[in-house]
Regions:
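Hydrophobic/aromatic-rich alpha-helical bundle segments in the mid-to-C-terminal region
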Residues: 123, 145-196, 206
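Helical hydrophobic small-molecule/effector-binding pocket
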Residues: 69-73, 88-113, 135-138, 163-174, ...
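Hydrophobic alpha-helical connector segments
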Residues: 62, 76-104, 155-163, 189-192
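Short secondary-structure transition hinges
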Residues: 104-136, 156, 183-185
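N-terminal intrinsically disordered/low-complexity leader segments
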Residues: 1-12, 152, 178-181
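Generic hydrophobic, amphipathic alpha-helix propensity
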Residues: 10-22, 38, 63-71, 137
Length: 206
């Protein structure tokens, strides 16, 4: 049911279901979360779920598409490319925004990744998220080349490599498995600094 047609109580109920799903997908993954888990966490009866969503996949698709179109895509419009090779603020600012945005929605990203391997609908969504990062990195490569740096880099290839590195790094270090299994401990600040440095050095070598 479209949110615009809901009553205030209906919007509140739907929001509770969505929030419960985000939390449980982050903790248990898509396959480890049942509809009963979601409605129980939302404090609603299982029957209520079907007033708003056809099934669990429909709920995930809605959450992912909303995150993509309402949060991720608009954020790219605010990105200003680096003014100079020593513009550390650009890299730190963009990576901080990326890290915080995806950390808050890691459950959605994990669930989409789990379904993308077998379902075209979610594979398409996953690639839309990836294009967001790739477009920004590719633009930064071209800016560096305009400044006389990274002339041997292929903008799209480099963008894919860095964007996928960011994706996997974030999933491991923010996801429930965490870095502990690797014997590592890293703060948000250190994670952001690491990703920023890798990106900047790839373009400028310093």
């Amino acid at each position: 049911m479209p949110a615009a047609t809901l009553t205030a109580k209906g919007r509140q109920t739907r929001a509770a279901i969505e929030q419960a799903a985000r939390k449980l997908f982050a903790e248990r993954g898509f396959h480890g979360t049942t509809l009963a888990d979601i409605t129980s966490a939302a404090g609603k009866s299982p029957a209520v779920f079907y007033r708003y969503f056809a099934d669990k996949e429909d709920l995930l698709a809605f959450l992912a598409e909303s995150f993509l179109h309402d949060v991720v895509t608009p954020s790219a419009l605010r990105v200003q490319l680096p003014d100079a090779p020593d513009d550390d603020a650009f890299f730190t600012s963009v990576v901080t925004g990326y890290w915080n945005m995806f950390k808050q929605n890691i459950g959605i990203m994990i669930a989409v990744a789990q379904l993308a391997a077998t379902q075209r609908r979610f594979a398409h969504l996953q690639n839309e998220f990836r294009r967001f990062g790739m477009d920004i990195v590719a633009a930064s490569v071209r800016r560096a080349q305009e400044q006389g740096h990274g002339t041997d880099l292929h903008p799209q290839h480099t963008a894919a490599a860095i964007a996928l590195l960011f994706e996997n790094f974030t999933t491991v270090f923010v996801g429930t498995s965490g870095p502990e299994g690797l014997g590592l401990k890293i703060s948000d600040t250190d994670a952001i600094a690491t990703l920023s440095t890798v990106w900047k050095k790839t373009l400028y070598g310093t």
